Design a protein with these regions (language model features):
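Short, positively charged and aromatic/hydrophobic N-terminal segments
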Residues: 6-9, 13-19, 23-26
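Hydrophobic transmembrane alpha-helices
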Residues: 34-60, 66-68, 74, 78, ...
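Juxtamembrane inter-helical linkers in multi-pass membrane proteins
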Residues: 149-156, 228-234
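Cationic, low-complexity basic patches in intrinsically disordered or flexible, solvent-exposed regions
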Residues: 3
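Non-catalytic, usually N-terminal nucleic-acid engagement modules in DNA/RNA processing proteins
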Residues: 80-82, 99-102
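General structural concept
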Residues: 91, 101-104
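Short secondary-structure boundary segments
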Residues: 66-90, 151
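Interhelical loop and helix-boundary elements at the membrane-water interface
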Residues: 29-36, 85-97, 139-149, 156-174, ...
Length: 310
């Protein structure tokens, strides 16, 4: 790690890797270019993933059930990412975790269980497409390791004494646990001996359609903001709903549950999709709404005649 940081902070001959010193947030007292920042995030996630894999392997050797071992490995990987966030004084180090963990784990779970049934293949297709879309959007909007998302800087300023507790449990661990709960229905597909049925395919289609909605919403938002900075995006999907990207995210996890329900019926595993819906409706959307109302005078009028979701 230290050699990577040294590489990214070489002298003027490495101008493509190092930018000027302003707006510095990390402990190295230097802000890296986007390319080096993305590479650094990748290294961090490899370290976190390796730590989680070692713990999972050890716990399963102790005869712990695989699902519980995976949960604890997920928690450990989150703590590792959180630790690097502390090192760089940037909670945004955690941001890609949401889109990276599910597709990677679902794929590794197929190798772990040796199950490559049609429902599992449908699950992998859906989650890798979704993960590609979400990670791609993160890569487009990511400004570098020296930039922290406005939500986190807001919490820093509002709760300076409690921030690190909020950081670990509220900003890192809660999303990890909600995503894990939403993933559980998908993990059960590896146990099913039944073949896919029409509802399984419908669930996959819901997932693919949801990720496509998000992809379209991303493109429309990026294009609009580039052409009309500071204005409210009210074109395309955004004309019909204030948060089409969040709508797609919520719907995606319901699609995963539909795939599960097609084989097992309705039971307690519906809780993951419900928790995901509650997270967006109770936290993510209200936070975004408050920011938009504060920063864009015409957002109030847009809010009055546009539904919250599509």
């Amino acid at each position: 790690m230290k050699y990577f940081l040294y590489f990214c902070s070489l002298n003027d001959k490495m101008d493509d890797c190092v930018v000027k010193k302003g707006e510095i947030r990390n402990n190295m007292k230097r802000d890296y270019t986007k390319a080096c920042s993305v590479a650094l995030i990748a290294v961090i996630y490899i370290i976190a993933g390796f730590a989680g894999w070692l713990l999972f392997d050890w716990l399963t050797l102790q005869a712990m059930p695989d699902i519980w071992a995976l949960l604890l490995a997920d928690v450990l990987a989150t703590v590792v990412v959180w630790g690097f966030g502390l090192l760089y004084e940037n909670v945004s180090v955690y941001d890609p975790y949401w889109s990276v963990f599910p597709p990677v784990v679902y794929l590794l779970w197929a190798f772990h269980t040796g199950v490559w049934s049609v429902p599992v293949i449908l699950l992998l297709v859906a989650t890798w497409y979704w993960g590609w879309r979400l990670t791609r959007n993160w890569a487009i909007t990511f400004r570098g390791i020296g930039h922290e998302d406005w939500r986190y800087t807001k919490y820093r300023s509002l709760h300076p004494l409690l921030f690190q507790l909020i950081n670990l449990f509220g900003l890192n661990m809660v999303p990890t646990l909600v995503v894990f709960a939403a993933m559980l229905p998908g993990l059960q597909l590896y146990e099913a001996g039944a073949s896919a049925n029409i509802l399984t395919y419908i669930g996959c289609i819901v997932c693919l359609a949801s990720a496509t909605i998000q992809l379209i919403a991303d493109k429309q938002s990026h294009d609009f903001r580039a052409a009309h900075p500071g204005k409210v995006c009210n074109v395309g999907l955004w004309k019909h709903g204030r948060h089409p990207n969040y709508f797609g995210e919520i719907q995606f996890w319901w699609g995963i549950w539909i795939m599960y329900a097609s084989l097992y019926g309705i039971d307690g595993y519906i809780g993951g999709a419900i928790a995901m819906t509650a997270l967006f409706l109770g936290i993510s959307i209200p936070l975004m709404e408050a920011r938009q109302l504060a920063n864009k005078p015409d957002y109030a009028a847009y809010r009055q005649h546009t539904r919250i979701l599509i």
